[in-house]
């Protein structure tokens, strides 16, 4: 489902102001900034920004948002220049950069590790305990696949032979499969873990993939945080409207700080935008690892993560690591 929300109002012109040349006048006109967010933690971090724009409280630019169910829906919108900013899986940002010959830049890391391995029972306590099991997950070709495969390999398990990974199109399918299969486990991101537990309180979080990733990196002598999501901007838009990009980042930072610091109020907004129900959001938000990292810190964290993915499978990042121009403001 797609929800369209948010539209800032343009400031009026003062009739007493002397006539100015066209270029000067153009700088006073709000820029239309079209943003696509994925249903989940990335959209949850934006809800304060969205609600303020929706209420007409942000008149600096003309803000509009749409919430999409799948990353597959975002790619064509970016390619066709139908959106200017998008929240996408971290590796997809690099894939888009390569597919568009540098047509996108990453402006912020917005979500760290949110993946959890869940089971019905109490048999999985280490990654090694996954040997011989069927793992249900959504997100083939994105962070879930590459993070899981890396963690399995570092624990001495072959993802192709020591476990069976069944890729589903939606997280709800994974939950259903978990309930049906004896000994099965499901890898789910927040807030979907909380959604599943609300429906079945026997579902237990067995492994925090964020912690397992960090342990695997440490054992391999590598240093990279598990990064789930980032925000990207079309390069053409960033070049034409750098002030609008900076305004976007300012509002986004404030939104993330509000969401992390005001969980009950943020949960109401999340429910209002039909991302997940308010009750689920209230429980899930503290575990969603919503963050805001820009500039050199963003580059340091994201480049390390992409290098690990590239070492596993070059196609995970679109065939090659992105160039310096990929990192906005770094």
Model-derived segments and their meaning:
Residues 51-60, 211-224, 290-299:
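Short, solvent-exposed loop/beta-turn-alpha elements that line the ligand-binding surface or hinge
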Residues 76-77, 95, 129, 176-177, ...:
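Well-formed, non-transmembrane alpha-helical positions, independent of function
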């Amino acid at each position: 489902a797609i929800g369209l929300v948010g539209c800032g109002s343009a400031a009026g012109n003062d009739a007493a102001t002397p006539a100015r040349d066209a270029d000067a006048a153009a700088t006073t006109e709000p820029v239309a900034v079209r943003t696509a967010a994925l249903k989940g933690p990335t959209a949850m971090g934006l809800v304060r920004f969205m609600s303020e724009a929706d209420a007409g409280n942000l008149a600096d630019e003309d803000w509009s948002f749409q919430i999409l169910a799948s990353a597959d829906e975002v790619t064509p919108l970016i390619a066709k220049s139908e959106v200017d900013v998008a929240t996408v899986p971290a590796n997809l940002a690099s894939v888009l950069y390569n597919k568009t010959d540098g047509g996108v830049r990453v402006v912020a890391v917005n979500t760290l590790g949110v993946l959890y391995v869940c089971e019905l029972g109490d048999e999985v306590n280490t990654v090694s305990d996954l040997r011989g099991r069927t793992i249900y997950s959504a997100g083939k070709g994105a962070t879930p696949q590459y993070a899981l495969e890396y963690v399995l390999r570092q624990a001495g398990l072959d993802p192709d032979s020591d476990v069976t990974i069944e890729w589903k199109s939606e997280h709800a399918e994974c939950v259903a499969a978990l309930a049906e299969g004896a000994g099965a486990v499901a890898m789910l991101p927040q807030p979907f873990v909380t959604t599943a537990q609300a429906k079945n309180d026997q579902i237990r979080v067995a492994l925090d993939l964020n912690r397992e990733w960090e342990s695997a990196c440490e054992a391999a002598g590598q240093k990279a945080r598990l990064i789930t999501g980032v925000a990207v901007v079309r390069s053409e838009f960033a070049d034409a409207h750098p002030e609008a990009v900076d305004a976007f980042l300012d509002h986004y930072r404030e939104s993330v700080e509000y969401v992390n610091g005001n969980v009950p109020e943020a949960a109401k907004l999340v429910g209002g935008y039909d991302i997940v129900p308010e009750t689920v959001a209230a429980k899930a938000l503290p575990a969603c690892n919503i963050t805001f990292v820009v500039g050199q810190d963003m580059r340091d964290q994201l480049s390390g993560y992409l290098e690990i993915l590239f070492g596993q499978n070059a196609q995970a990042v679109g065939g090659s690591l992105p160039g310096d121009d990929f990192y906005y403001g770094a």
